[in-house]
Structure formats: C-alpha cells, structure tokens
Amino acid sequence: MVFKVFSFVAFMACSTVKVGSIVWVQDPEEAWIDGEVVEVNGEDIKVQCTSGKTVVAKGSNTYPKDMEVPPSGVDDMTTLAYLHEPGVLQNLKSRYYIDEIYTYTGNILIAVNPFKQLPNLYNDHMMAQYKGAALGELSPHPFAVADAAYRQMINEGISQSILVSGESGAGKTETAKMLMKYLAKMGGRAVSDRRTVEDQVLESNPVLEAFGNAKTVKNNNSSRFGKFVEIQFDQRGRISGAAIRTYLLERSRVCQVSDPERNYHCFYMLCAAPPEDKRKLKLNDPTEFRYLNQSHCIKLDGVDDSKEYTKTREAMGIVGINLEEQEAIFRVVAAILHLGNIEFAIGEEPDSSVPTDESKKYLKIAAELFMCDEQALEDSLCKRIMVTPEETISRCLDPNSAALSRDALAKFVYSRLFDWIVNKINNSIGQDPDSKDMIGVLDIYGFESFKTNSFEQFCINLTNEKLQQHFTQHVLKMEQEEYTKEEIEWSQITFPDNRYVLELIEKKRGGIIALLDEACMFPRSTHKTFSQKLYETLKDNKYFSKPKLSRTDFTICHYAGDVTYQTEQFLEKNKDYVVAEHQALLGASRCTFIAGLFPPLVEDANKQSKFSSIASQFKQQLASLIEGLNTTEPHYIRCVKPNNLLKPSIFENQNSLQQLRCGGVMETIRVCRAGYPTRKHFDEFLDRFGILDSATLDKSSDEKAACKKLLETVGLNGFQIGKTKVFLKAGQMAELDDRRTEVLGRAACIIQWKFRSYLTRQSFIMLRNAAINIQAVYRGQVARYRFENLRREAAALKIQRALRIHLDRKRSYIEAVVTVQSGLRGMAARVVLRRKTKATTVIQSHCRRLRAELHYKKLKKAAITTQSAWRARLARKELRKLKTDARDTVVLQAAKSMLAEKVEELTWRLDLEKRMRVDMEVSKAQENAKLQLALEEIQLQFEETKVSLLKEVEAAKKTAAIVPVVKEVPVVDTVLMEKLTSENEKLKSLVTSLELKIDETEKKFEETKKISEERLKKALDAENKIDNLKTAMHNLEEKLKEVKLENNFLKESVLTTPVKTASGRFLSTPLKNLQNGLFTSEESQLSGAEFTTPPRIQESGSDTKSRGSHIDPQHEDVDALINSVTKNVGFSQGKPVAAFTIYKCLLHWKSFEAERTNVFDRLVQMIGSAIKDEDNDANLAYWLSNTSTLLFMLQQSLKSGGTGATPLRQSPSLVRWMTKGFRSPAAEAIRPVDAKDPALHFKQQLEAYVEKILGIIWDNLKKELNTVLALCIQAPKTFKGNALISITTANYWQDIIEGLDALLSTLKESFVPPVLIQKIFSQAFSLINVQVCNSLVTRPDNCSFINGEYLKSGLEKLEKWCCETKEEYAGSSWDELKHTRQAVGFLLIHKKYNISYDEIANDLCPNLQIQQHFKLCTLYKDEIYNTKSVSQDVIASMTGVMTDSSDFLLKEDSSNIISLSIDDLCSSMQDKDFAQVKPAEELLENPSFIFLH
C-alpha cells in the first residue's frame, strides 16, 4: 500500500530514465538496491545492480539515485534532491554506520538505536553546545528538540510536548531520559535544596523502570506501560512542579511470562537483595518461584540485580518514599511471589479445592507478609460468596478457578501497588497551580504486529492510530505554515485520514470496544461468541476483515499495515472487576500501607452493577491525552531499532523500513510530496543548476530573479519562488538533473576536443624540436672530429721537441754526478765528527734527567710529611674542642673521662707514629744529602772534562781550517782521537757507577715509602676512631641539652619568674655564631711555617641570649608597614617595592624565627582585601608581581629548621675559614634563615595567593575570549552574482589579539615574572584550541573549505602575535594550537580523495584522534570548488580502526586554577638583584624603620 504512494513520482521519473542512469530497484531481501540502467524497453527497465545480479523492473517501481549526496548523508532528509523511500533508507543507513544516529525529517527527529554507549553525545559539553542554538544549526540531537521546545515555551508562552515513539528496543526510554535531563539542566534552580524538583523528576525514571519495565524478546529493558511526564515551569523558566501520567500497565505479565522474557525487574532485584532483607521476607533463589521460573532467563548480561536494588532504594528515597514505605512496598512484592507458589488440589467435594500440602507454607508466608488471617486468605482464593435478596450463598471453586483467583489477586495487588507509587511520586514532586507553561514528554509504545496479537496489542495500536492522526494533522499544518511563510501560491493538500479506522474501534454503537464491553457484561459470553458478533456487525466495513483459516481472529487495516488479533484472552483482559473477597481481605490488613492500597468502595449497592472495562478506561485516558496534546505545540521523535539482534553496526533494511512506515515517517514524506517536495535555498539552487544558464547569472545580482529567470529559460512549469527558497513539484528535480547532465556532457566533449588538440600540437612541437636537436648534435660531432685531428698533429711536434731536450739534459746530468761524488766523500768525514759530538750531548741529557728526578722525589716526600702533620693538627684541635664543650658536663663526667682516656691513648699512639716517621725522614734526608754531595762532585768533574774537551775540539777545528783538505784522502789526528776515546770510556764507567748507586737509593726509598704508608693508614684509622668518639660525645651533649631544657620548662611552670640558664642558651646557639672567632683574612691563615689552631672566642650568656631572641615588633610598626604597602608604592629597579619592604621588615624583626607571631596573619588579610576587586586587571597584576616576588625571596632564604633544632656540628674546613666574611651585597639582601612553623605556613599561604590571583586573571581573560570565540569560529558569508561564497574579513580575530596585547601590557607594567605570563597565555591558546577544534568536529557548517581559509587567517594573526611577543612571554603558546592547526590544514587540502589513511594519521594530523579524523572526513564540504572528501576506502579503514569509545572532543579545563611550580618561578628570577632596591619612602621617615636605610 505504501509503495503506491510514490508511484506517480516514479512514473514521472521513468520518462527521464536513460541507459547509464543510476536508479533504485526493489529487492526482496534488501528492500532497495542501486544499479545502472543497461537497457530501456518501454515500461521495462533492465538494471545491472551493484550486488552483481541483473534485474528487470517496471518503471513505476524504480527511483533515481542522487549521486551528489555526501557519503555521510544529510542532516535533514527534506533537503534530499529525491525524497523517496530508498533515498530516505540509504541516508539513515549511511549515517548509522558513522555513528550519526540522529537525523531530521523537517522538524521530526529520527533516532536509530546504536546498541552501544556513546557517552560523548550526552555530556555537559554537548548540552552547552545546544543551549540557545537554532534547530538545524547543529547536528541533529534530542537536546536540540528539547531546547527548541524550551525556547518556544519561554518566548511564546505556549506549552510544548515532545512525543517519543517506536517499537520495543528502539531506545524510547533512553531518549526520554535525555530529554528530561536536558530540561532539568535548563530549568534547574540556582539554590541547592535538599531534594529539588528536577532531581525528583530524573530519579523517578529508575523507580518506574524497576516496577514497570521488563525484558522482552526485543528489548532487555522494555517499558510495559505508557508514560507522559508533565514538567511545569514558572515565569522565570525554572522547574516548579511535575506530574507523571501512566497508561495501560501490562498486568498479565505478573502471572504469565514467556520464554525467554522476564517478569518485572523489581522481583529479581528483591531476590538479589542483601541477606538480611531476604531473610526478613523469606526469599530464596528466583528459580523457586513460579511467577519467575516460567522462563529460563533469570539474569541479564551486564546487569547486577543487587546493585540495581541498591540504586532503586536510593532513588525511592529521593522521590519522597521513606524507609518505612519502602519496606512495605517490597513486602507486597515478596508476598506476590509467595502467592504465586500456592497450588490447589481437589477438595472433599468434587467442585471444591484446597491448597496442597507443599503450598501451605507459601500460604502462611503470604498471609504473614500481607498481615492478614491465613484462613481468610485461603477462603478468598477457594470460595466465592454470592449475595441474593434472600440469603448469602458460599460457593466453592474448583482448582482451575482457584488458580485463576490467585492470579487475579496477584495482578490486582500489583496494579494497585504501581498506581500508588505513581501517585506518591506525583504528590512528592508536587504540582504548581500557578504554572501556566509546561513541557510534556510522552514515552509511548510504538505500533506492534506479532504472530500472536492479543488485547495489549489492540490497545497499543489504538494509541498509535490516535497519535498518527494527531501527527498527520500537525505535519500538514507545518507544511502549510512553511508555504505561507514563503508566500507562495498553494492549494489545499489532500492526505489520508485514519478516522475511519478510529471509528471502527471507538464507535459508541457497533464499534469493537463497544461490542467487547457488551460481551464482557454477559457471564456466558466467550471469545467465540464475541468473534461471531464482530463478524456479523462489521462485515461491510472495508477496514475490518476475517481471516480465512480462523473462526475467532479478526484483522484491522491500520495505517501501518494489516494486523490480525486473536480473541482468546480479550474478554478476561478487558474485565476490570474487583473480587469482593480480595477487597475485604486486604482492606482489613493489619499493615496500614496494604490497607491503604485497598480503600473501601464508596459506591452503594445499586451502583455496583455498573460495568467498567479496561478498554473503556483506556479509551477515556487516551482521549484525555490527545485533548492535552492538542493544547500544546508538539515535537516528534521517532525511534528506530536497526536490527533484532540488539547488536551494534548492523542495519537491517526491511526491519528499519517497516518501522519507518509504522512511525509515520513515510506518511510525512508523502504529505510533503503532495505539495512541493523539493525545496532549495536560492544559493544552493544556483550552485547546482547555474550552469544551465550562466549568461543569466552573470547579468543578475538578485538571487530570486536569477532563479526565476533560469527556470523560465529551461522551460519548467509548476514551480514556485518563495522568499528564500525554490519550490519544485515531484519529478522536476530529476528533469533539471537530466538537463544538467546534458550540459555537463556537452562541456565534457568540448573539453576533450580541446584537450586532444592540445596533445596533438604538443606532439608535433616535440617532434620538430627533436629533429632540430639531432641535426645540431651531428654537426657538432663532425666539428669535434676535425678538431681532434688538428690536435694530434700539434701533439706530435711537441713530443719531438721534448725528446731532443731530454737527450741534451742527460749529458749534462752525467757531468754533474762526478762533481757530486767528490763532495760526498768530504761529507762522510764530517759525519763521523758530528756523531761523536752527539754522543757527548746524550750523556749530558741523562745527567740533567737524574737531577730532576731527585728533585721531584724530594718534593713528594715533603708533601706527605706536611699532610701527616696537618691531619694530626686537626685531630688535636678536635680533641681540645671536645674537652672544652664537655667541661660543664657533670652528669656524664664518667663517660667523658673514659672517652678522654681513649682519645689520649690514641693521641699518644699517633704521636709515636709521627715521631718514628720523623726519625725515618731525618735518616733519609741525611743519606740523600750524602748522595747529593757525591753527585755534585761527579758533576763538577764532568764539567771540567767537558770544558777541556770543548777546548780541544776548538783547537782541532782551527787546525783543520789551516791545513788544506786533500780530496778523497782525509787526514785524521789519531793521537787526539785516542785521547778522546779514553776520556769517554772513563766517563761511561763513572756514569754506570752513579746509576747503580741511584738504583740502590731508590730501592731504599721505596721500602721507606711502604713503611710510611702503613703508618699513615694506621694514623687515618686513629682519626676515624676519633671522629666516632666525637659523634658519640655530640649525641651525649644533645641528650644533656634536652634534659636541661625539660628542667627549665618545669622550673618556669613552678616559679612565677622564668629562669633561663646561660648554659641552655649557649647550647642552643647556632654554630654559625662561633664562626666569627675563626680566621678573618688570608694572611692569618697562611702566616708562619706551621699551621696553628685558630683561637676560640667564648661569648657570654647575655650576648648569646640577645642573639637568639625574637624582636617582637610593636603594633604601631606593623600598622605602619601595612598602611604603607597597601598603597601602590610602585617599583624600583624593575622590582616591586612593597615585597622588598615587607621582606626586610620581617627579616629585621626576626619574624621568620619566631615560634608565635601575628604579623603573617595581618599580611595575609591585607593581600586578601587588596584583590577583592577581581575585575581590575591592573591591580591584580600589581599584587601578582608583589606576591610572586615575596614568595621567591622566602623560597631563597627560609630553611626548615624546626623548633629547638641544633645544627649538626662539623669540623670546620679550611675553605670555610678562608671564605668567611666575604659576601656580596645581593647575598646580604637575601640570606638564609632558619624558619619556624608560622613562617613556613605563611609561605604556603603566599603560594596559594599567587595561584589564586593567576586564576582570577585567567578567568577574566577566559570570559573575554568566550564572548569573541563564538564569532571567530564560523566565517561570515555573502552572495555575489556568480553564486560563489566569499569571505568578509571580520575583526573578531583582531579583537582577540587586542585583548591579549592589553593584558600583556598590563602584566609587563607590573613586572610580573615571565613564567607566570607564559602560563596565562598558554591557557588562553589552549582554550582557543579546544573551542575551535571541537566546533570543527561537531558543527557541519564549520567543517568546510571556506571556513578553513577563514580560520587559517585567524591562526596567522595569532602566530604573528606570538613571534612579536617573543618566547620570553609567549612561551610555548603556539604549540597549544597543534590540534586546530592540523585540522585546518586538512580542510585546506584540495585533493583529499587521493589521500590515504596513513598520510592523514601520520603526516597531516598526527596529534588528532581517530574519531576526530573520522568526523573531519565525514563532515567536510566545499562550497567553492565542490571537491570531494576522502575516499570510501579511507572511511572504511577509519571505521575498522576505531574503538567503541566515541570521545572525539578535546577536554576543556573547566577549573580556573593554574598550577604553579616554585622551582620554575625561582629559575625565572635567578638574575634578580635586590641590593639596589629602595624601600617604601613613607617608612624611611619613620624612626622605627631606621634599619631600612
């Protein structure tokens, strides 16, 4: 039936179908498949499908496929060029596979259940995005529908309603939760009540789900009742009240459960309750109860019933159900479970029944839980009392009737319990009688059609028929409103009205409900007689029919299809009678809660005969619901279940298409098609079809006139031109596309012709250039050959000339050789003389080396001796120090004496070793002196011999010069040579003897050295022992001081006047006070031949006391300081004066070393008062500079000394003595101080204030950026004659730059440390990065080429600002924009279709997540060049890599706290020199602050 709706559209499209067209054809499995037309034979069309098979279809059953639809589909299906059934189905399917589960059809939202968690779609950030956004501005979402309803209610003062429908498992309940969550967020109260209305509304969902939801075949959490939540708002738009209306609870499920379904959740939760609750209610495993074990499904995967029980109890407390009422509710639930285990057997009489022996315990437990009489409960189940005018008759029931009575009691009790819970929630939340505006959320069951359809399906489908009638009327109204808004001419649209089906069901006389009520009033009526009555009465109604193979079923032709109902249970389920015995039994219960569930009937005996049925009550409720909806402005959400497997990423075409038909979506499309189904904005229309008449576009600058002229030029009739859109009849879009295809085809032919001509000409030019090049190469080769011959002739002449020259030179060389030989013979004689002279030089070098070695060994020995003497001196000094420090020790005198004896013994041993070592050194010195004398004598003889030899050599030289040289026969003075030779031999023997003596001396020296090293080692061991004794002595002194301090404390507590001992003060005096007695100059340390122990200056008790005490400042001084620094005292040498002044005063007053002082508290209060004005950035920057500088000085000077801590006594080193007294002025300005707890606490408070001021400044900048960022994200658009979009340069990015410059100038004027400025700007750029990047992956309009160019220009301005600001203040701010820079870079790439996934993930956008890649690729669009996004293979690769996590948004730091590292602060201020900083001038005039001068 629905296929015929589009037949006329398909017929019009068929006339334009040609070979090569891409069309949709019907398929029995996939519903619709696409393919290419390969043959057209009249009405028959042969299509080659993409699946591989060939199909022959009628033209009336084919639809054109829009090839320009993006791979990710469109947000609003009314913008599809071809609005037909396969196009709608394909759009939903393509969006579903990329997790875009929401799609608009006009103002109707279609939600496809993803069957997986998508938490990123419903967080607070998404709520903030949709707040105040127009419908359609952002991606489709339930938040957008809720926001539109809320805004319309506030602006127009009209109540709204949101209707959520769909079949079981489609996600209606979750969607309704999201709607109420958003409305509660929008209408939440500012004050924090104990239980706000919005909290109670939200927490009512888990309570109602526990008692009204169950697992069905299609859904694990199916609502078995309808729910309409009315949320009331006051005049300010805040929630002021709420009410919950429920419809048609499925009572039969309490007693009958099909496999693999479950009963209501509350039963299983109670069986999983804590042991004490189960023991109290006598519950065991759920498989032991008949009402639960009818199905094998007891537990749900991923659901912990024990945790759900706890959550339900908490939710019940929030909605106003106290603990006592909760206990009573679950007592009733447990009683129903025990009641179901009661079984009956035949009693003493044939038609009587009694409980079986096994069931009596359950009867007893049920009576205890109901708090009624056990026998009365048994009689109410097994007997009936009939009252006649004459007498009262008691009639027994057979076992079957007793079982039915038991089930009726269970259903009756559960129904009353559910109604009580709903009323309790309503009473607890409360309704606002003064409220005029409300938003209703209807969570209602969708159209149902199963193999077996009973009374519940009949009522559900009746509800959907009524809602469909309301829905169709509203859709038609919206369609006509748009026509009126666009001011086009239109005629009345005819649409199918299902009022005839409603009359069939609801007609007062002869309707199905009327006939059903009539049958229920007669006791002897059965479902067969009821069915026969239906056949006789409604046989002529075309919407009613009787199945051929059934005698009791009937079929109704609903708007969504034919449904066959089985009448077997209709009569029983329609009866709403109350058994008097049950009413009396439970009304008399001793439990006030249970008795309250069954109040006595107020009707008299005459009114009891009036019949009331479930169908009639439901009909009245439904009429009341529709009447309430008619007074509101409706909004529709249609939920679709994509598959029956309840698994993600599976989209079943047939199943989804049937739900779209049942949900009225296809009917909406048919109503739209009855008028003008295709509507395009002027710019979109001109972008697509402007090529049909480009001349008209060039002449016209008016979009409307251009569209009209274009349509008239192509000869299209029946169109309408509105104010902003072009309206086309069905089939006209296909005709325009055919014209456009023809124009593109002709243009392609021209382009090919031009291109082929270009290729041919290029080939000719290439051949001509090649011929010219070949000729040139040949001519060059001939010329080179000729040149080579000429070069060879010239070379031959040169060779001949060179040969003649060579022969002449050879002759001259022979003559020169003879001359050289004569000179060489003379040279040989001179070489012999030089060799002897060299030997003499070697001997001299050996002697000099020997002297140097002896000198080195002498120095080494002296150094060892000096070191030994120095270590002994230090040991003796430490011994004297220990003796002096232990002089006043009385209690530990014995220990000291024993230690002193050990020290003396070790000292004696050390002195003995030293004396032995000195004796050895003396003997070695004497022996070395003898050897030295011998060596000097030998050297003296050697010198004399050398002098004589030199004289003889000189004489020989003179003689040689006088006597002429005989050629080739040298004359040698043999006598002189023999003399020299003998002298040389003597010298050699002398040197040999000296070397032997030196070797012996070295051996003795090595033995002496070993002995000395052993003795030195023993001396070091002795020193270690002395150090250990010194440490032990120090520990004893510490214990002694603790004892003395305790004694002093006890004396002070007893005596009125405190007594302070000088010794205690002396012992607690820091060691640094004694350093003044050490060396003060380098001369005093190095004077004299020996090192002497420095004198020790003992201080008197009064001096020590004055140095260690804290100078308490007068209150007037503190007030003067605070009054002075509270004002802006400015800066000196680029440093804050206030911070330096405070530090100097605290240092002088010794407040850092005080155990108790209130100065720090006064300063903290002063800083807190100074920064109260959070909007004044200049004041905040001034105090940020002061607090950070003061924190730096405290960090540099304060040391955690603790209370009563004693510095570790160390042996003073030579370096410390030498450097004592030499300090720079900067070191005097900031010097180390042993801080106490108040000072350390003040330092922590100061650090907190620095972070607080940083946070306030960042918060001010954040507010300023947020106001401008929303305008910077999307490029403004304008239209020009050629329908291209151009960018108008806006100043929004410049506003950001100016704001950053202003803040930077303020911070620099206050000399704020650069590291703090870097942190502020890093946070600012991080905010820009998060906002812009998130907008690109959430808003389709922003993810475009034109917007990428706009954002690129803004990023260039920010980069220029960072470069001008320099790294000192900007830091790594530019790196914070890495996500945005990569995303914008991707948008500006032209050939995205050729990019692979690896290039995107590794090269283009390495810092973006896979979900963000996916969003950018699917949302991208190009309005200028119409370039495509990435290929489907890349999309498929991303889909395969993506995990279940859908978190594609960057996280924004919502806190305003900027963490501070003191180390970073100190490193940035290491070059601070405070020596030249001037204190506050106002204090310089005060005599109390004379120390500041």
From Swiss-Prot:
Compositionally biased region (Basic and acidic residues): 1102-1114
Entry keyword annotation includes Magnesium: no
Matching SMART domains: DIL, IQ, MYSc
A molecular function (GO) term: actin binding
Span of domain Dilute: 1161-1444
Domain called IQ: residue spans: 744-773, 767-796, 792-821, 813-842, 836-865, 859-888
One GO term of the biological process aspect: actin filament organization
Domain characteristics, as noted in the entry: IQ domain mediates interaction with calmodulin. The tail domain is a globular cargo-binding domain.
Protein's recorded name: Myosin-13
Provenance organism: Arabidopsis thaliana
